[in-house]
Amino acid sequence: MAIKDLDFSDILDVSALKRDCDVIFKEDSKRIADIKSDLLPIFRRASTEGREKARELLKADGSGIDCARRISWLQDRLIETLYDLACQHVYPKDAPQIAVAAVGGYGRGTLAPGSDIDLLFLLPAKNTPDMHKAVEFVLYLLWDLGFKVGHATRTVDECIRLSKSDMTIRTAILEVRAICGRKSLTDDLEKRFESEVVTGTGPEFIAAKLAERDQRHRKAGDTRYLVEPNVKEGKGGLRDLHTLFWIAKYYYHVRDTADLVKLGVLSRSELKLFEKADDFLWAVRCQMHFITGKAEERLSFDIQREIADALNYQPRPGLSAVERFMKHYFLVAKDVGDLTRIVCAALEDRQAKDVPGLSGVLSRFAHRVRKIPGSVEFVEDRGRIALARPDVFKNDPVNLIRLFHIADINNLELHPDALRVVTRSLSLINDELRENEEANRLFLSILTSRRDPALTLRRMNEAGVLGKFIPEFGKIVAMMQFNMYHHYTVDEHLIRSVGVLSEVDKGTAVDAHPLANQLMPGVEEREALYVAVLLHDVAKGRQEDHSIAGARVARKLCQRFRLTGKQTETVVWLIEQHLLMSMVAQTRDLHDRKTITDFADKVQSMERLKMLLILTVCDIRAVGPGVWNGWKGQLLRSLYYETELLLSGGFSEVSRKERAQIARQALYDALEDWGQKARRKYTKLHYEPYLLTVALEDQVRHTRFMREADKQEKALSTMVRTHSFHAITEITVLAPDHPRLLSIITGACAAAGANIADAQIFTTSDGRALDTILINREFPIDEDETRRGANVGKLIEEVLSGKQRLPEMIATRTKSRRKKSAFTIPPSVTISNGLSNKFTVIEVECLDRPGLLADMTAVIADLSLDIHSARITTFGEKVIDTFYVTDLFGQKVTNDNRQASIAQRLKAVMSEQEDELRDRMPNGIIAHPDVAALPAARTAKA
């Protein structure tokens, strides 16, 4: 159906619009400028009301494609009316000689509420200045109405010439559509474009469009499972669907997607899949534009919940409404990938047949298929595995698994035609195949491959095989978790986890994960570890704890995979405890003996400890870019070594002292360019926790930093370093210790707009604090980030020395940055005396915000508590901070009423009800002559 044949008059009364315009032109004395001024409110009202009506109808019927067509129709009528006015009243002689056409996406008859309007003004070969003025009349009014108009004014000859050399222009003209004006010009352009540009250039166009698609994917994020996807440009988004249609239209000369069924390119069910995907993606995109009031293409967390509500998604047990919506989105993105493979396979087959004469014979001879050793079911076609016969899966469904296994061991790509048949054969994967011993043996071989198991698993997942073969995995395919911590869907996270394990297994991750690489060759149950890594989050999205439910799921699957009883118990334990090591390392004081003994009681064996460390590394690394950093690696290594000593019978305070002495000696030796007196002085400054936790390279850096500060007689100094691992900048602060030091440092970071990812708190034997703050990186270039870090360090120094007033800075800088969060996390405070023999442990969990850590540490100081150590941990938008505290007498807080008061005050801060605490922050507490007399906030061994 032609666009003009559609009737969307329920969103615009065209006759009424024209009558309102005619009234303005009845006054002959008006100048053009005055006429334009009078027309603007009329057209602005028509556009606004029409779009609002389109939004109401989208809410009512849910059809995204109809909404996009309504807005396109509305835009057509506005442009047509403006053009008619130019013809009738402004340039009656020349305006009728031009044509106004839509091109690009608008030419297809679809338009998102905030999208650009791409117009082509066609002029006859002999044109006049007034024709150009008529174009300007329409254009200027559209611009004055606030539309973003992409436009070109050309003759047909110019269009043909330019489209031959410019692929962007060629693609735009491919979907040219007459809106109004001299239709013969548009018809002539379409005919000449087909005969002079399209004919014989199909392969060239296809190659260009696919290359353009790949480049676009790399820019937008080369996975369709990013949890904040770009709906227009991202993988599996609208542009991918449109690229498919452009290619099909160009090569097959079709006018409509339905024509691809007649040509045998798509089946009827695949056409339905195309139309459903198109409709859904348009619904999402239109809602995004309506909700944000602009051409927003990124489906960010801020708007996901609102869009889920607008599209009428409801929560289900284990999944919120927004998570159900996003799962639907990712499943649609996967469908788009399936359709891409199907069309590409058909095109390749068609192109091979279309090569004429001797060239075709030679081409087919050069590209003949080759046998694959050991396989009669599959053949090699130009480095890709292809089917030897079309019925290979029907004859033996095990071949659906064998295909990927043979591709893996022979390092072959998958032929798109083979993938098309796989997609159409998924119904063959039934319970009988799932229980088949050979199928499970092949799958386990794929999973534990020494080559690239993640690549093969991802191919299986993209083809739909993985989720069908392991239905429990199928339940988490395309599932997102509505938080800022996880960057990928659950299935993509699990596959990436296997990829990290493979890197460790092959020894290619030595620099990033030295301990994991060292331990991996000694792991006795390699198969069990791979299974545990693949399945550790398989029960996400259920009402019960996913670790417990996942262990239960894994027990059944291990039997299917024919693992031994011992292997099964190992997998079950690893999945049940897969969060344990990460949480202990990041939220507990690793120098508190009870932390280690409690952890060792749960682990019980060295083999489990090795495997749990490796699983933890894989899990954190696969969460997303910037989540893993060197500090987390150091925490995990410290926990491993402490637990190893205990499990092997070597854990004692003596051994800790010996190890600390060895570390002290290593620092002494590393300062070989210093004199002995200076080496002895500075190596004696540090206590055991520092020596056993901080890497030697950092100890050397800190010691040189301290000596330089002493030479310059600086009581206060900061040092900045950007790390090679992603998204972290380190600021080290040397200052005399003080009760509110940590609060003021973190407050200064908040005032500077720096988000703290972690903090290391140490005190030296001469009463100074050596605190290292890790802040999230803001700039990609090291020089820019170093400059920014130095500015944060300078602000810390100015606040501590009294040059800047922190309360006002926090109040002005953080409040202006705050906005309503897309997330809600109920504040939680847990106070325990059972986690440490010496300290009361306060653990807080809440929504992160600028200045939160400063507020919490201020409250703790205000409550007359000493912070002996702290673990600052952020998981996306959620923060879990743990403080090891005593009262001013060095005792645990045991009084129930006092514990309740602490919890109440901290919850008030987390709910932003205690900003007045900032007013009581001291000003200039550090750089005073009598600073040494100030009370210590942290014991010497903090």
Curated annotation (Swiss-Prot):
UniProt keyword annotation of Cytoplasm present: no
Q: Where is this region: Uridylyl-removing?
A: 374-729
SMART domains from the UniProt entry: HDc (SM00471)
Q: What is known of its domains?
A: Has four distinct domains: an N-terminal nucleotidyltransferase (NT) domain responsible for UTase activity, a central HD domain that encodes UR activity, and two C-terminal ACT domains that seem to have a role in glutamine sensing.
Q: Which cofactor does it need?
A: Mg(2+)
**GO terms of molecular function:** [protein-PII] uridylyltransferase activity; phosphoric diester hydrolase activity
Any coiled-coil ranges, and where? none
Record's superkingdom? Bacteria
Which segments constitute the HD domain? 490-606
Q: How is its activity regulated?
A: Uridylyltransferase (UTase) activity is inhibited by glutamine, while glutamine activates uridylyl-removing (UR) activity.
| Protein's name according to its UniProt entry | Bifunctional uridylyltransferase/uridylyl-removing enzyme
Where in the numbering of this chain does the ACT domain appear? 730-811, 841-920
SUPFAM superfamilies referenced in this protein's UniProt entry, alphabetically: ACT-like, Nucleotidyltransferase, Nucleotidyltransferase substrate binding subunit/domain, Poly A polymerase C-terminal region-like
Tell me which UniProt keywords the record has, alphabetically: Hydrolase, Magnesium, Multifunctional enzyme, Nucleotidyltransferase, Repeat, Transferase
EC assignment: the record states: 2.7.7.59, 3.1.4.-
Role noted for this protein: Modifies, by uridylylation and deuridylylation, the PII regulatory proteins (GlnB and homologs), in response to the nitrogen status of the cell that GlnD senses through the glutamine level. Under low glutamine levels, catalyzes the conversion of the PII proteins and UTP to PII-UMP and PPi, while under higher glutamine levels, GlnD hydrolyzes PII-UMP to PII and UMP (deuridylylation). Thus, controls uridylylation state and activity of the PII proteins, and plays an important role in the regulation of nitrogen assimilation and metabolism.
NCBIfam families according to UniProt: PRK05092.1, UTase_glnD
Q: Where do the record's region annotations for Uridylyltransferase lie?
A: 1-373
Could you mention a single GO BP entry for this protein?
regulation of nitrogen utilization
Annotated InterPro entries = ACT-like_dom_sf (IPR045865), ACT_dom (IPR002912), HD/PDEase_dom (IPR003607), HD_domain (IPR006674), NT_sf (IPR043519), PII_UdlTrfase/GS_AdlTrfase (IPR013546), Polymerase_NTP_transf_dom (IPR002934), UTase/UR (IPR010043)
As for family, the record states: Belongs to the GlnD family.
Under catalytic activity, the entry for this protein gives: [protein-PII]-L-tyrosine + UTP = [protein-PII]-uridylyl-L-tyrosine + diphosphate; [protein-PII]-uridylyl-L-tyrosine + H2O = [protein-PII]-L-tyrosine + UMP + H(+)
